[in-house]
Amino acid sequence: MSPSSDVFAAWLASLEAKHLRELTFREVSRSLRALSATYVERRHTLVDGAALSGRGKRAAFALFYGPLHHLLVAHIVRELPSALDRVPTLVDLGCGTGAAGAAWAAAVTPPPRIVGLDIHPWAVREAAETYRTFGLVATTEQRDIATVTFPKGRAAILAAFALNELTDMAREPLLARLAERAAHGDRVLVIEPLAGGVARWWNRWRDAIERAGGRADEWRIRVELPAIVAKLNRAAGLHHREITGRSLFL
């Protein structure tokens, strides 16, 4: 399992204790199957918050997808040149449980202050706990990331598995805004699932990022899954043998 730090293990243990306190493992695994179906077959419902509707789906998201996102981002930022450069602030757009933002921030020395933003109140609370567990200084706020006001000064901006949950009308203006921030010295990292049909806007964004001097990558990494993730993986019949994603970095 990587990263193999005590804090990562403690975070996983706290997630398991919290989310299995009032739900059985069977209930969570059943909710994970439903959540996976939402991502694969009913992605149009994501803009309405379908992924986090109900305790079961929220627990499944936190226990399964959160650790996977953390491991993926931790790997990506180690591979991207300048991703680990010192920066005062990390803006975690659509922070979810904070797993992805914590992975990037924890890899930087010294860790930046995190600003976690999400439209879902449960996600904001969950992210605050995640950042705190990793010993990161952070503020969280319930905000629509499509209309976010970026902080003054240099920052790293992360949008991990978040932009595809916006409508096209809400998403498109962000491209120019993120490119402008990068032109003034910010680091911008966008991550989405690898499946080609998931983000139909991806190729257009990729071309724009590459024209601006950025890069696009696809990732397939094999790691030992954390025990709770592996157990849910088997129980829900998802057969995750590797962690995958694609990224844009500017």
Language-model features, listed with the residues they occupy:
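Conserved SAM/SAH-binding beta-strand->alpha-helix loop
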Residues: H120
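Conserved beta-strand signature within the Rossmann-like core of class I S-adenosyl-L-methionine
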Residues: H184-P193
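Class I S-adenosyl-L-methionine
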Residues: A212-L250
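Conserved SAM-binding loop of SAM-dependent methyltransferases across substrates and taxa
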Residues: T97-P110
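A short SAM/SAH-binding and catalytic strip from SAM-dependent methyltransferases
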Residues: A155-M169
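Class I SAM-dependent methyltransferase Rossmann-like catalytic core
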Residues: V47-I76
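N-terminal auxiliary segments of SAM/dcSAM-dependent transferases
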Residues: M1-D48
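A short glycine-rich, Lys/Arg-flanked "PGG" loop and its adjoining helix->strand segment in the class I
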Residues: E172-H184
